[in-house]
A protein has these predicted regions:
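Short linker/helix segments within small regulatory modules
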Residues: 140-147
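Short helix-coil boundary/hinge micro-motifs
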Residues: 1-128, 132-135, 139
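Hydrophobic alpha-helical segments
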Residues: 18, 33, 144, 165-170
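Basic DNA-binding region of bZIP-type proteins
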Residues: 153-169
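Residues immediately within or flanking Cys/His clusters that coordinate Zn2+
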Residues: 126-131, 147, 152, 158
Length: 170
């Protein structure tokens, strides 16, 4: 599941957050200190961790849509992001960016990352693996942007083997 290079820029934060839950094993690494530290949630309360999990699953739903799944009718993503104040900053070189008012806020950092990725066209390339028992987030670097699995060696191979066996049965 982790054979790909990390997503570029702020998308790496989103990829890391989505991948804190391993659907196959059921392990939620938000229950561990290292994963919380990587996301800036070291001293997070139970409510903040619940919000992080809600954010994670809302982002996973969007990544699945990026991969070609039908849109989910409603996720709390808009509501979560609306609570993340951002400010426009202009660097000395004249470049502008949206930055979190509170850089310690995970939701604000995610909102800024989404805004930057949407502006540079990379947001739709953050996808979730098509395999139902995986849904691992990955950045699609394929030229056509039509990658379907987090790993051709694991999830892609399993899907192709299932398709082959199904075709042989008919």
């Amino acid at each position: 599941m982790a054979e790909r290079a990390p997503a570029p820029g702020g998308l790496a934060l989103i990829e890391t957050l989505v991948n804190t839950l391993d659907l196959e094993s059921g392990v939620d690494s938000l229950d561990t200190d290292p994963a919380r530290a990587a996301l800036g949630l070291v001293d997070a309360s139970a409510a903040e961790l619940a919000d992080a999990r809600e954010l994670r699953e809302s982002l996973r739903a969007v990544c699945l849509v990026h991969g070609g799944h039908p849109p989910v009718p409603a996720t709390p993503l808009d509501r979560l992001l609306a609570a993340a104040p951002l400010v426009v900053t202009v660097d000395p070189d004249g470049s502008a960016a949206l930055r979190p008012v509170d850089p310690g806020s995970l939701v604000a950092r995610v909102a800024a990352a989404i805004a930057a990725a949407a502006a540079d066209g990379t947001w739709p390339r953050l996808k979730a693996c098509e395999a139902a028992d995986c849904h691992w987030a990955y950045y699609d670097r394929s030229p056509a942007g039509r990658s379907r699995w987090c790993s051709m060696a694991v999830c892609g191979s399993r899907a192709k083997m299932r398709a082959y066996r199904a075709a042989r049965r008919t």
